[in-house]
Amino acid sequence: VAKAVWFKEVASEKLLEQLDEKWIDEALEMTGTATMRRRRLPAEQVVWLVLGMSLYRELTIPEVVAKLGLSLPGERGLTVAPSALPQARARLGEEPMAWLFDKCSEKWALESARKHAWRGLSVFGIDGTCLRVPDSKANRAHFGGQSSSEEKGESGYPLARLVTVMALRSHLLLGARFGSYDTGETTLAKELWPMIPDNSLCIVDRGFLSAPGLLPYSLQGANRHWLTRAKKNTAMRVIRKLGKGDELVELNISPEARANDPSLPEHWTARAVRYQRRGFQ
């Protein structure tokens, strides 16, 4: 436990050290939040406060202020009341933080992926999960949740759907999208595919094996590849054998998918590699 706490402390400090202060100014200017500087709490200080609150969740807000060494003067040099800090965070809104996240993730994840390339390809992965959010009427209405039988009712907490694209060698996020529990992972992933650069390989699980996501990703760029395990019931027709356990195959695209995107063809091709690990059937 002590080692985990130490690692978290070092990682948090390292992240804050790598954060360019100019990006915070840009985030405020690009989202029209710079006018907050005229208030008692400078907007850039509030951004640092929100970052600290996310990294040091076990600390109170005043403790975060002290740990980061933030200077939060009030009017006429008076100290800002602790109750003003949550209000300042709410005034800041999500736009500057979202802009800052996109800026940091794009720079750090792309640099890392290029540095740890495999056979000249930057390696990424897309996957999804569900997160519990605070139980409130607003969150239940917005996110929904898992429902079961009438006797058991709904899940204990509202659930948000999260899909991310990650540089796999470093685990740095390139992008993230949230949605309601009823929103499918492939739907959220549509906004993430364009973030992946050329000369890349994206590894996904079987749930993402669909033409609407994979086909545009591979065709609307240069040297883009994807890799996934196929489901046992995946229908494919062999076009040509390339070697032992190596085939060029054709897969059908459903009428529903083509109705949603008329640009999709009736079929698409992929390379199928078949193998069996020792001890597995």
Per-range role (PLM):
Residues 1-64, 89-92, 99-103, 119-122, ...:
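Single, function-defining residue in the core of a domain
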Residues 60-76:
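DNA-recognition alpha helix
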Residues 69, 84, 197:
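Acidic/polar active-site rim loop that often engages polyanionic ligands
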Residues 71, 92-95, 107:
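A short structural micro-motif
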Residues 75-94:
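Major-groove recognition helix of helix-turn-helix-like DNA-binding domains
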Residues 77, 94-97, 113, 198:
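Secondary-structure boundary/capping residues
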Residues 78, 117-118:
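Short helix-terminating capping/connector loops at secondary-structure junctions
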Residues 109-117, 133:
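Long amphipathic N-terminal alpha/beta scaffold segment
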